[in-house]
From Swiss-Prot:
Subcellular localization(s) per the UniProt record: Cell inner membrane
Protein known as: ATP synthase gamma chain
Organism: Methylobacterium sp. (strain 4-46)
Coiled coil: none
GO cellular component terms, A-Z: plasma membrane; proton-transporting ATP synthase complex
Cited function: Produces ATP from ADP in the presence of a proton gradient across the membrane. The gamma chain is believed to be important in regulating ATPase activity and the flow of protons through the CF(0) complex.
Topological relation to the membrane, as annotated: Peripheral membrane protein
Family matches, as InterPro entries: ATP_synth_F1_ATPase_gsu, ATP_synth_F1_gsu, ATP_synth_F1_gsu_CS
Gene this chain is encoded by: atpG
Superkingdom of source: Bacteria
Cited CDD domains: F1-ATPase_gamma
Source species taxonomy: Bacteria, Pseudomonadati, Pseudomonadota, Alphaproteobacteria, Hyphomicrobiales
Similarity section: Belongs to the ATPase gamma chain family.
Amino acid sequence: MPSLKDLRNRIASVKATQKITKAMQMVAAAKLRRAQNAAENARPYAERMAAVLGNLATNLTPGAETPRLLSGTGADRVHLLLVCTAERGLCGAFNSSIARLARDHARRLTAEGRTVKIICVGKKGYDILRREFRDQIVELIELRGVRQLGFDNAETIAQNLLGRFEAGEFDIATLFYSRFRSVIVQIPTAQQIIPAEIPPAGEAAQTDAAYEYEPDEGEILAALLPKNLTVQILRALLENAASEQGARMSAMDNATRNAGEMIKKQTLVYNRTRQAQITKELIEIISGAEAL
């Protein structure tokens, strides 16, 4: 049985940990509102951009050349996985769920005879995936020093992908991130971004008004596709940021509650041990008095 000193030290240690988890929960809650607003504001813009591209694609002049960012290379040999996770941990299963989705996708492609390349955005996803795909990871992009994600961050990543695509390094690129739904629900998501996925013709027609394009649909489509890539990556980064803070807030809340339960149990053990020790000392005193 542990001594009273050991129990006091244990209780003090858990209380110190509880203060840390409570502080982290409050910080995550403060960051969550801003991150959630940014993610929710980015959604309609990204969805509208995809709808406009769908309208343009369906109205291309017959026989016009389709941009490679929409038509692809015509091959399906090399797949690039852009896996977006966090730079830090202590956010529940947020990082592992995204990495698991990417890992399963990579395994399936490998089993089908495809070549897989991986770019990790965020250190935690890299730490998980390198155990199995060390040779397939071609780059790690860290955002540790970025205080607030913005268009410039997404554009840098998009230009990286465009350069690799134009150099013929891959045929298809898939983006992995976590879509934010609520504090306790974040959905790991895979989205093909090269060649761009656009809404079906019927869906595009329902969401878009009639447009007249100048100079023509082909030129506008070619100009918008790189911007759409940046927008889709930006949306993923913002969704990830909100999901990370929601997951961390939930995880730290659970940790704080568990610490409270542990403190109660250890305090009960401490009181019982102290009571037993006092009782033992009283018995020894009484026995000594009777012996006299």
